[in-house]
Amino acid sequence: MENSRTSTFTAYVTVAFLLISTFVTMVVTESQIVWVPCNPRSKKTDDAGICRNTY
């Protein structure tokens, strides 16, 4: 019975570690993925660099 508890605990720790490491990886790499240029056809930037709609 003790061996079953140990293996269950090990499985829980492994799953928790994988989830935490996946979350940390997503947070660290997200800032490098989301750089989108701010100049589609209907948008212009003002002097401060803020996107403005032009109709």
UniProtKB/Swiss-Prot annotation:
The keyword Disulfide bond applies. It is found in: Secreted. The keyword Disulfide bond applies. Expressed by the venom gland. Its main location: secreted. Residues 1-31 form the signal peptide. Keywords: Disulfide bond, Pyrrolidone carboxylic acid, Secreted, Signal. The modification Pyrrolidone carboxylic acid is found at Q32. One of its GO terms (cellular component) is extracellular region. Contains 1 disulfide bond. This is U17-myrmicitoxin-Mri1b. The lineage of its organism: Eukaryota, Metazoa, Ecdysozoa, Arthropoda, Hexapoda.
